[in-house]
Swiss-Prot record:
It comes from Helicobacter pylori (strain J99 / ATCC 700824) (Campylobacter pylori J99). L-glutamine binds at G57, P58, G59, Q88, S134, L135. CDD domains: GATase1_Anthranilate_Synthase. This is Anthranilate synthase component 2. GO terms for molecular function: anthranilate synthase activity.
Length: 194
């Protein structure tokens, strides 16, 4: 499965690209100012359904170039995996609000509660993750299932019908001890849905 990676001009982007390449995936990186129609054309040319990966980034979904337009065009056509800003943008695309979190965290290890779900198979009932965010998704609609949370902050969301999966935390962070395994299971899960 080829991964089309949207870089939201974030310093963590290439850490994620590296992790995905270590797992054996071909990764093509595009910045969030790419023309959405051009990107969809490239993705449609792939012989096998590719995955769209939305990176972390500064700011909020509304200040992230063409990100929301890209999501609107890709949703329900391609599997999408988002991290941090990626979760916020996906949640907003379903009608959630993005609000300031009670706690601003930039490099904090946090234990989060995991619900039983295929992406967490073998990872336990909780997980230590690296968090870097001041915003959070709020008022999620029923078609976005929260599968991990901390202090009422959605840490992982999924919509299996639309092939959407996203994490508020950073799987590539050194603080996320099982991050590579989680990334591998996440891409595998979305590939099976495609």
């Amino acid at each position: 499965m080829k991964i089309f990676f949207i870089d939201n001009f974030d310093s963590f982007s290439y850490n994620l690209v590296y992790e995905l390449e270590c797992l054996g995936y071909e990764v093509a990186v595009y910045q969030n100012d790419i023309d959405p129609s051009y990107l969809m054309g490239l993705m449609n040319e792939e012989p096998k359904t590719p995955l769209l990966f939305i990176s972390p980034g500064p700011g909020n979904p509304n200040s992230s170039g063409n990100l929301l337009k890209i999501i609107a065009m890709a949703k329900k056509k391609f599997p999408i995996l988002g991290v941090c800003l990626g979760l916020q943008a996906l949640a907003q695309s379903y009608g959630a609000k993005i609000i300031r979190s009670k706690e601003i965290v930039h490099g904090k290890a946090t234990t989060i509660a995991l619900k039983k779900h295929a992406v967490f198979k073998g990872l336990g009932e909780s997980m230590v993750v690296g968090r870097y965010h001041s915003l959070m998704a709020s008022g999620l609609p029923k078609n976005l299932e929260v599968i991990a949370e901390h202090d009422n902050i959605p840490m992982a969301i999924v919509n299996e019908e639309d092939k959407i999966l996203a994490y508020q935390f950073h799987p590539e962070s050194i603080m996320t001890l099982q991050g590579r395994a989680l990334l591998e299971q996440s891409v595998g899960f979305l590939r099976e849905l495609s």
